[in-house]
Amino acid sequence: MEHNKDTTVAETSATQWHPAFFGSLQIEFEKEADKLIFESEHQLSTKPMAIDVLIIKKISNEPIKKNIGRIFRKHNIIEYKSPDDYLSIDDFYKVYGYACFYKYDISITNEIKITDLTISFVCEGYPRKLIRHLETTKKYKISKHGNGIYYVEGDIIPIHII
């Protein structure tokens, strides 16, 4: 049975569990507290989160013929970098995080399947540092699928760089 996230939060909001858990972690690490920094309810962003472009396919299994859209599934997240900007390693993780948050930020648990997402990065030049990072650190394979289209293979979410 799928759970409605709003109902679940409302039902459990009477008891504030996070402060107790935070305190118990501080006690648990008491002997090594000088090596650690503890932050409760750390805010992840100072700016509002926004996906540059979201394309939702009306019919999930209908293939897209255009070369830059062949990778598309139901929910397609696109990050655009202007000609005077570059696609960095941190941009990759930011957009990947947005994809995960987009999947999460709905009322019904798992309504958007992880296998229904894609991520596309559109940038002016070839992002060498990012590609090197993806290949060496993430162990992804990068393959060319047309003029200026590179698939990033090895993740559950299909990713490509244009």
Region roles according to the model:
Residues 1-162:
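Conserved single-residue anchors adjacent to enzymatic active/cofactor-binding motifs
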